[in-house]
Every structure is written in structure tokens, then in C-alpha cells.
């Protein structure tokens, strides 16, 4: 297993996202890729609803660096393809959504479902399998309530399983409440947060800035290794 990249924690409002976590249903430690708020402009005031942290498996850095190292933070932040590569990459992801204002499971699932279905229909990939996955997603959340400080947790397996769990006190359970086997849903939940129409532009900017820095470090480490094995000139 590759070493967890050295990253810092991120404070979003009163929510602290630690530098690394072991998600429910996973055997891996994932590092904090980025974090930010989700909010809406309501009557001229920006109202913050949730704080969102996105964690990535260690292999995300070398995998993404192949295509994206050397790009500026602005180039990454403005690139739809970059965030698609994060969403669809062959590495584990974990999303922690912590409430700032009270939220019901039905409120949350209705909005996420709407965003997922809209995305699938826009790219022509909405089938009966996705409809059933959304139904199960809504079922898992329908009776839940999330006072401020509670969290909805998603472990996104690259094999196509979405593990859903909840936390009332900031701790992470070892196992999930439910697992939905649908690759498109597994990706679409994260797409709804950091994709083209993602609900947290702040989390996207944070991801771009932190990954850009890690790509630079990755390139520097590769250069050092290359110099170690290069023959010494006579």
C-alpha cells in the first residue's frame, strides 16, 4: 500500500475535516482531497447548509498526475474533465457531508436523486438499473434526520459499490448502513458535488488547489528518483 500523502486538515465553518480517515466498509486510509460548504443564495444572503469533505485513496495522486501535473490551480478548477477523472478514477473515494443547518433524509435524498437523474439523462445512460438504485438510495435515507453536526457518509468503491452510513458525533463507523451495487450511482453522488454542476464550488476549488500541490510534489519525487538511478558521467 502506498503511503498516505502528507496533507493538512481543513476547517469548514465549525466542522474540522481531518487529514486522513478510514471510511466505513473500507480497509484503506484515505487522504483529504478537499473540502468546502454547500449553500444557496436566498433573498440576497448566502445560506450555508452543509460542509463537505472529499477523501481519496493514495493512488489517486500518481494516477491523476499522469494527465494533470503541470496544470495551474485555475486550470484544474475550471476543467470539467479533471473532476470527471477524479469521479471515475480507479481508486476509492469517501465523501463526508456534515450538516450546518438541520436536514431530513428525504430533503437530502430528493435533491441528490434529482441531480443524479438529470446528469444521467443528459449523457443518455439512465436505465432501469439506475432507477432501482435511486429507489434504494431514497429508501435508506427517508426516515433519517440530521441535526447540525450530524453526517451522511458515502464510501465510493471503484468496483461500483456505494456504502452509505451515518454519524451523529463526528466518529466514523466501521461498517455501513447499506451498500448499493451500482457503478453509475456510486459515481453520480460524487459528480453531484464536484462535477460540472456540482453543489459545492468551494470544495472543487479546494480539491484543485490541494491536488495541484500534490502533483508538483509527485513530479519532484520522480525527478529525485530518476537522478538516483541515472549513471554518473565520467
Swiss-Prot record:
**Annotated residues for binding of substrate:** 50, 115, 192
Query: Signal peptide: which range, if any?
Result: none
- Keyword Cytoplasm in the entry? The reply is no
The transmembrane segments are: none
- What SUPFAM superfamilies does the record tag this protein with? Chalcone isomerase
Q: What is noted besides the main data?
A: Part of the biosynthetic pathway for all classes of flavonoids, a large class of secondary plant metabolites, many of which are brightly colored.
Q: What is this protein called?
A: Chalcone--flavanone isomerase 1
Q: Which gene encodes it?
A: CHI1
Amino acid at each position: 500500500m502506498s503511503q498516505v500523502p502528507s496533507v493538512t486538515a481543513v476547517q469548514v465553518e465549525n466542522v474540522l475535516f481531518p487529514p486522513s480517515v478510514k471510511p466505513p466498509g473500507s480497509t484503506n486510509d484515505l487522504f483529504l482531497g478537499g473540502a468546502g460548504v454547500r449553500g444557496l443564495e436566498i433573498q440576497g444572503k448566502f445560506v450555508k447548509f452543509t460542509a463537505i469533505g472529499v477523501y481519496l485513496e493514495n493512488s489517486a495522486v500518481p494516477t491523476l498526475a499522469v494527465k494533470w501535473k503541470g496544470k495551474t490551480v485555475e486550470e484544474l478548477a475550471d476543467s470539467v474533465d479533471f473532476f470527471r477523472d477524479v469521479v471515475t478514477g480507479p481508486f476509492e473515494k469517501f465523501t463526508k457531508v456534515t450538516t450546518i443547518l438541520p436536514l431530513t433524509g428525504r430533503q437530502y435524498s430528493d435533491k441528490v436523486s434529482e441531480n443524479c437523474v438529470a446528469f444521467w439523462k443528459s449523457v443518455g445512460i439512465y436505465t432501469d438499473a439506475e432507477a432501482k438504485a435511486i429507489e434504494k438510495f431514497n429508501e435508506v435515507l427517508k426516515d433519517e434526520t440530521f441535526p447540525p453536526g450530524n453526517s451522511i457518509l458515502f464510501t465510493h468503491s471503484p468496483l461500483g459499490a456505494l456504502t452509505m452510513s451515518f454519524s451523529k458525533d463526528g466518529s466514523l463507523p466501521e461498517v455501513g448502513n447499506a451498500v448499493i451495487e451500482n457503478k453509475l450511482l456510486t459515481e453520480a453522488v460524487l459528480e453531484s458535488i464536484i462535477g460540472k454542476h456540482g453543489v459545492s464550488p468551494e470544495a472543487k476549488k479546494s480539491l484543485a488547489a490541494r491536488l495541484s500541490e500534490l502533483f508538483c510534489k509527485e513530479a519532484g519525487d520522480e525527478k529525485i528518483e530518476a537522478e538516483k538511478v541515472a549513471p554518473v558521467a565520467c
